Each structure stands twice: as C-alpha cells, then as structure tokens.
Amino acid sequence: MVVGPLIAQEEAPTFREDQIYLSIAYPYFSDAPNTLIQNKLSYAFSFGFVRDMPINKQRSLAVGIGLGYDQATIYNNNLFTYAGNNISATVIEGGYQQNYLRMQSLAVPLELRWRNATETKHAFWRIHTGVSVHFPMQFKSYNQTPTGQINTAKLPSKGTILRLNVHFGFNTWNISIAHDLQPWAV
C-alpha cells in the first residue's frame, strides 16, 4: 500500500449558453410619413440558433454568432407599387379588405453576451447586445380590395440591412429591442 498526496487538475467549467430562439414582436415604423398609418395587429417573428463562445474563465462573458429567419408583416393604409425603378405609396381612399407589407430575411446575429450563470445555476440574468446582419429574401406589398381583387408588388430592397439589438432577461424569458439602421426600401 502506498500513501501519499494526490494531485489532480481542477476541471475547467465547460458550460455555454447556446440558444435556440423563437420570438414574436410588434414592428413599428419610427420614421414613417404622417400619411402612413399602421392598423390591425402588425407582427414579426423570428427563429434561429446562436452559438455561444465564452471569452473569460468564469464563462460570464461570451461572443455569440448565429443564423436565423426573420419575417415582419405590417398592416397599413398605403398601396405600394413598383414601376420604372420607383416605389410609390398611395393612401387607399376607397377601403380595402387587407393591406400589408411583408419583409422576409435571413439573419446572422453577432452578439456580446453577459450572464451571471454558473455550471449549476440555470436561472440567471443575461444581457446580450450586438448587431444582426439581414439578407433580404422577399419584400412585397399585398392588397385585397373590397371586391376581392388582389394586387401584389415585389419591392426592391436596399440589400443587406444592419439591425442593432439589445436583449435582457432572466431564466427562460427575454425582452428585446431592435432598430434597423437603414430603411428596407430603395
């Protein structure tokens, strides 16, 4: 029998906060002309995945990068058309059944992430901030008149859209605020 001190390496924590996200939001035009009025319940939803890459020993700071899908549907009172490289918006005077703008994009979020989590503490506070790069897939206008006539228009987008994001939350719930740095339309 041998008696002596045992020496072992302390195991480093290995947890990370990889995230599968699903969000529902209310989109709002912050700089729309006075003639554009949002109506009904406009909505946006997104889903995706963010890979967490801790950058300190405590694993309380991390960088996140992900991939997702984003769609916003904004009900409003304007008929949007595209002709001759020009988008025009006209207030609909005679009524309509349904009228909206729909924007769909592929999103790549880049985040700086803070949390007060440990390897065994699963209910914790978090703040994530960063940008998401959006690659527009579709930008269109849809209008249905009271007689049932349907008008659609594919609208050109400016290309890549940058969006500032701030997410804060506790445990499984987050509140998010986002702002596009440039308009979608050309």
PLM ranges: what are they?
Residues 9-17, 54-61, 117-125:
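Short loop/turn motifs that connect adjacent beta-strands in outer-membrane beta-barrel proteins
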Residues 24-30, 67-75, 114-116, 131-139, ...:
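Transmembrane beta-strands of outer-membrane beta-barrel pores
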Residues 8-52:
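Short glycine/proline- and aromatic-enriched beta-strand/turn motifs that initiate or cap beta-hairpins
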Residues 11, 153-186:
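Predominantly the C-terminal beta-signal and adjacent terminal strand-loop region
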Residues 47-53, 67-69, 108-116, 129-133, ...:
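Residues on the lipid-exposed face of transmembrane beta-strands in outer-membrane beta-barrel proteins
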Residues 33-40, 74-84, 89-103, 136-146, ...:
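Extracellular/periplasm-exposed beta-strand and loop segments of Gram-negative cell-envelope proteins
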Residues 98-119, 125:
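Outer-membrane beta-barrel transmembrane strands
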